[in-house]
Amino acid sequence: MAIGVPRPLAIEKPQAVDLVQAARYFGAHGEPDAATLALLQKCAVPLLAVAMPQAVWLLADTPALTEAGLLPGEDVHKHLTGCGQAILLAVTLGPGVDAQIRRAGVGDIAAGVASDALGSALAEQAADAAEAQLDRKS
């Protein structure tokens, strides 16, 4: 098989951003305080509005991935020890999210950092949804 053909994977936009996860990315330990939660809630609305999650995946023989230079570093090799094949998954929220993060940070550094944390949480949610789709396919 070597390296398979990339295939698109339809994923839906989450209804909301996981604010607790976003708060962790923002640097909060434990439950976020009211001010942090309010900032995240405020910044989540425009970020979610522009998000357009998309995913692509492929199945490949792990030796072919190594030969192609797609698995740099030793840690990934340790994780894949004994695996003949691996699924590679890529997820994006689209360019609108990056633009919104930049807009939010103009004149308000905290809003920019909060938006970045929200984008990370939303990307993780999209990746989880894509992984669930792949699980249903197998």
Feature map (PLM): residue ranges:
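Compact, glycine/acidic-enriched structural inserts
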Residues: 110-132
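Conserved small/polar residues in nucleotide/adenosyl-binding loops
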Residues: 138
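Active-site helix-to-loop segments that bind/position phosphate- or nucleotide-bearing substrates
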Residues: 1-115
